[in-house]
Structures are given as C-alpha cells and as structure tokens.
Amino acid sequence: MIGRLRGIIIEKQPPLVLIEVGGVGYEVHMPMTCFYELPEAGQEAIVFTHFVVREDAQLLYGFNNKQERTLFKELIKTNGVGPKLALAILSGMSAQQFVNAVEREEVGPLVKLPGIGKKTAERLIVEMKDRFKGLHGDLFTPAADLVLTSPASPATDDAEQEAVAALVALGYKPQEASRMVSKIARPDTSSETLIREALRAAL
C-alpha cells in the first residue's frame, strides 16, 4: 500500500496532481481544500495517500496531513459514501468545517454539497459522530479551519474551463458548474481561485 509520497510536482490539473517520485509519476486525486495548499509545479511536495483498488482502476487519494486522510477513511466507511463523494465533501468544506457540522448536527451545510441529500446528510451526522468518539484526542486543531492563503497559479485563458471541469469532476452537473463559475468569474483570475470561490459561494 502507498501511504506517503515525497516528490516533485509535475502537473496540477484540479482536482488531480501529478507527482514524480524516483522517476515514476503518480496521479493523485486531492480535495480542493488540500489542493490549494500545494506548492507550484517544479517544487517538492509531501502528500499522505490512501490507495483504493477497484475492478476497473487503482486510484490514489492525497492529503496534506494524516488527520485529513483519517477523516477521508472514516467517510468512505459510511453507507452510501464512496471515494468520489468523500472527495467532493472535503472539497466543498474544510475538514474542520465538516467536523463542526457533524458535532453541531447541522444538516444545512451538508445538503449544499453535490450528491448529498437530506437523508445522506442525516446518516453522515449519525455515523460520523459515533466514529469521532472512537478516535483518540482531537481529530483536528482550530488552525485547520483557517482561510487558505497560499499563492494561486498564474491566470490562464482557459482558467474558467479548468474550473468548470474540476467542479464537474467533483460531482456537480456541467450546467450547474458553469453557472457557479460564471457568477464569480473575473479577468486575470486563476482556475484555483475560481474553484475556491465557487465552492465557497455554493455554501
């Protein structure tokens, strides 16, 4: 099992990042909240990973720390929640925001995420709240809820298209993704910034 990668970022195509380790390129799926904190292409990154094997694919999911990975693992144990939906959840809100929503039993923020209806949100709250009790110590620190301020990639002509594609990959319908991006689009804005602001506005 691959649990950690340390290598050079070759390409960033949200929500995917290509990391080269020892001459091998690993394609890693990352929640956007983690993706924002990655360094630029050409720089070294350390990513904690979870390896998922399916009949038709072998996928790596990456996170900036072990706590985020732990939350992802707990999420995919929930009935009806697979890796794709877990990725969408942790892209739409930070890990700390999700923990807070569960502990406060707030259904509202969860049902705004793609693929989550009221029943799924209620089930998440019940199951995850029980799991949090079984974890030793605090799963996350208050610092995990800080606004991410890492520098964004330079804007490109197709930044809006990249942002829409990333939102679709996270589970939003194409028309909905286009509408979300068009609402907050501004000249000279990077795709990462567009994605972050679109997800924030959706909540």
Curated annotation (Swiss-Prot):
Gene3D superfamilies: 5' to 3' exonuclease, C-terminal subdomain, DNA helicase RuvA subunit, C-terminal domain, Nucleic acid-binding proteins
Annotated compartments: Cytoplasm
Predominant localisation class: cytoplasm
An MF annotation (GO) of this entry: four-way junction helicase activity
Entries under SMART domains matching the protein: HhH1
Stretch list, region Domain III: 155-203
Keyword Transmembrane helix: no
GO biological process: DNA recombination; DNA repair
Region (Domain II) residue spans: 65-142
Keywords: Cytoplasm, DNA damage, DNA recombination, DNA repair, DNA-binding
UniProt region (Flexible linker), positions on chain: 143-154
InterPro entries xrefs: DNA_helicase_Holl-junc_RuvA_I (IPR013849), Hlx-hairpin-Hlx_DNA-bd_motif (IPR003583), NA-bd_OB-fold (IPR012340), RuvA (IPR000085), RuvA_2-like (IPR010994), RuvA_C (IPR011114), RuvA_C_sf (IPR036267)
Pfam hit, one: RuvA_C
Keyword Cytoplasm on entry: yes
GO cellular component, one term: cytoplasm
Region annotation (Domain I) ranges: 1-64
Quaternary assembly: Homotetramer. Forms an RuvA(8)-RuvB(12)-Holliday junction (HJ) complex. HJ DNA is sandwiched between 2 RuvA tetramers; dsDNA enters through RuvA and exits via RuvB. An RuvB hexamer assembles on each DNA strand where it exits the tetramer. Each RuvB hexamer is contacted by two RuvA subunits (via domain III) on 2 adjacent RuvB subunits; this complex drives branch migration. In the full resolvosome a probable DNA-RuvA(4)-RuvB(12)-RuvC(2) complex forms which resolves the HJ.
Reported function: The RuvA-RuvB-RuvC complex processes Holliday junction (HJ) DNA during genetic recombination and DNA repair, while the RuvA-RuvB complex plays an important role in the rescue of blocked DNA replication forks via replication fork reversal (RFR). RuvA specifically binds to HJ cruciform DNA, conferring on it an open structure. The RuvB hexamer acts as an ATP-dependent pump, pulling dsDNA into and through the RuvAB complex. HJ branch migration allows RuvC to scan DNA until it finds its consensus sequence, where it cleaves and resolves the cruciform DNA.
Annotated domain remarks: Has three domains with a flexible linker between the domains II and III and assumes an 'L' shape. Domain III is highly mobile and contacts RuvB.
Record-stated family: Belongs to the RuvA family.
Name of the protein in its database record: Holliday junction branch migration complex subunit RuvA
Organism: Shigella flexneri
